[in-house]
Curated annotation (Swiss-Prot):
Its main location: cytoplasm. GO terms for biological process: Mo-molybdopterin cofactor biosynthetic process. GO terms for cellular component: cytoplasm. The lineage of its organism: Bacteria, Pseudomonadati, Pseudomonadota, Gammaproteobacteria, Pasteurellales. This is Sulfur carrier protein FdhD. The gene is fdhD. It comes from Pasteurella multocida (strain Pm70). SUPFAM superfamilies: Cytidine deaminase-like. It is found in: Cytoplasm.
Length: 273
């Protein structure tokens, strides 16, 4: 299914501005634009709605798996027995069949996260729930930072939704040779990462790192570490809390990934150049 919805600009009585120098006047022309679809997606565990988030409606099974792992709802992929994506009134339900042990724990957390766009603190009742006490990551990988420029090119070229709409974030998983293994896109940067982590959960032997097109927030660091991935690279900056958490989890965190440059915040032992 094509989840990109096309609207003619004339329908909305708007014009796409196009500058042309002609007799010192500005001309305008009607143009058709691609808009990224954004819909409410409810994650329903064992028949009970847990959260509603605004998402791009694709790769939703990956989203459910990645969100469940990163939020600590499940301990391993096999704790989910089944995932069904079902159209609902004005949105989509992702119905997740969860192991009883995990469902009992989920109900005890008493989280109400309706209306989120991917921010993990919204709806959390206790501040202790924000800062997860994760074990330090082992150091099992090394990456040649000289390969980063090629990774950035691959990431940009693979962003189909981003190229067509200009309004989505992307998260990519690269192996240690710098090859793009998977890319996920979404209107929300955290959701794009959740979708990627859901894919990664099905590839237990995959060694590599995550590259995202956004800043590195504390929650993105936490999600990455919770899924056992040792390195997160962001195109924009990291926040102070993200750096502090990366140090605690012994995760390699890199920001300002641009052509010919990068800022290493933590975990330089996994990098060489």
């Amino acid at each position: 299914m094509n989840w990109i919805t096309k609207f003619t600009v004339d329908f909305f009585c708007k014009l796409t501005k196009k500058q042309q120098i002609k007799n010192k006047t500005t001309t305008y022309e009607a143009k058709q634009e691609n808009l990224a679809t954004e819909v409410p997606v409810a994650l329903v565990y064992n028949g009970i709605s847990h959260t509603v988030m605004m998402c791009s409606p694709e790769n939703l099974a990956d989203f459910a798996m990645g969100f469940s792992l990163a939020e600590g709802i499940i301990d391993k992929p096999s704790d989910i027995y089944g995932i069904d994506v079902v159209p609902a009134c004005q949105g989509i339900e992702v119905q997740i069949e969860l192991a009883t042990r995990c469902f009992v724990r989920l109900k005890a957390q008493r989280r109400t996260l309706a209306g989120r766009t991917g921010c993990g603190i919204c709806g959390t009742e206790q501040l202790q729930q924000v800062h997860k006490n994760l074990p330090p990551l082992e150091r099992t990988i090394q990456f040649d930072l000289n390969r980063l420029d090629a990774c950035l090119i691959q990431l940009q070229q693979a962003q189909v939704l981003g190229q067509q709409t200009g309004s989505t974030h992307a998260a990519g998983f690269f192996d240690l040779a710098g090859n793009l293994l998977c890319l996920r896109e979404d209107v929300g940067r955290h959701v794009a990462l959740d979708k990627l982590l859901g894919w990664h959960a099905k590839q237990p032997a995959a060694k590599g790192f995550v590259l995202v097109t956004s800043r590195a927030s504390y929650e993105m660091v936490q999600k990455t570490a919770a899924c056992g991935i040792e390195m997160l690279i962001a195109i924009s900056a990291a926040t102070e809390l993200a750096v502090n958490m990366a140090e605690q989890y012994q995760l390699t965190l890199v920001g300002f990934a641009r052509e010919g440059r990068a800022t290493i915040y933590t975990g330089k032992e996994r990098l060489f150049f």
